[in-house]
Structures are given as structure tokens and as C-alpha cells.
């Protein structure tokens, strides 16, 4: 449903933003890299709609891992 898609995107955006801000504070990416990381996570992750708290935690972990891999690969700087 549209509502579950909104929740999923909020989870991904929050986790991606937190991971990107942490990388920025560690001087691994630029300030503008935060926005790029969030956009990439929102457009690049295909996750099922969360149906439980464990689904929410899984989506959060997946988004953080996705952003970390973007940074480690040099796609976001």
C-alpha cells in the first residue's frame, strides 16, 4: 500500500542519513555527500514493506550497510 511505502522510505531515509552524517563527521565524505548518499539509498534499495518491528530493524540495517558500501567503494565522497 502507499502508506507502507511511505513508512519504508522514512526508515531508509533516516538510516541512510544517520550513516552518512557519521561518515561526514569522520571526514570520510563531504557535506554534499550526505544528500547524495540519501538519494542513492532511496533510489537503489528495494525492500519489502515492513510488517513487524524486526522488519523495520532489518530495513534500517540494510540502508546503513548500503550507504557504507557506497562510501567504501568511493561512489560517495
Model-derived features with residue positions:
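Short, small-residue-biased leader/transition segments that mark boundaries at the very start
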Residues: 1-7
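NAD(P)-dependent dehydrogenase/reductase Rossmann-like domain
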Residues: 4, 12-13, 29-77
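Long, well-ordered amphipathic alpha-helical subdomains in the mid-to-C-terminal portions
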Residues: 15-20
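Hydrophobic side-chain positions on well-ordered alpha-helices
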Residues: 23-24
Amino acid at each position: 500500500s502507499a502508506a507502507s511505502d511511505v513508512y519504508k522510505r522514512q526508515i531508509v531515509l533516516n538510516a541512510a542519513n544517520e550513516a552518512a552524517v557519521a561518515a561526514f563527521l569522520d571526514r570520510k565524505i563531504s557535506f554534499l555527500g550526505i544528500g547524495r548518499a540519501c538519494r542513492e539509498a532511496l533510489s537503489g534499495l528495494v525492500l519489502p514493506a515492513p510488517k513487524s518491528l524486526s522488519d523495520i530493524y532489518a530495513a534500517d540495517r540494510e540502508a546503513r550497510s548500503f550507504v557504507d558500501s557506497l562510501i567504501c567503494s568511493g561512489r560517495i565522497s
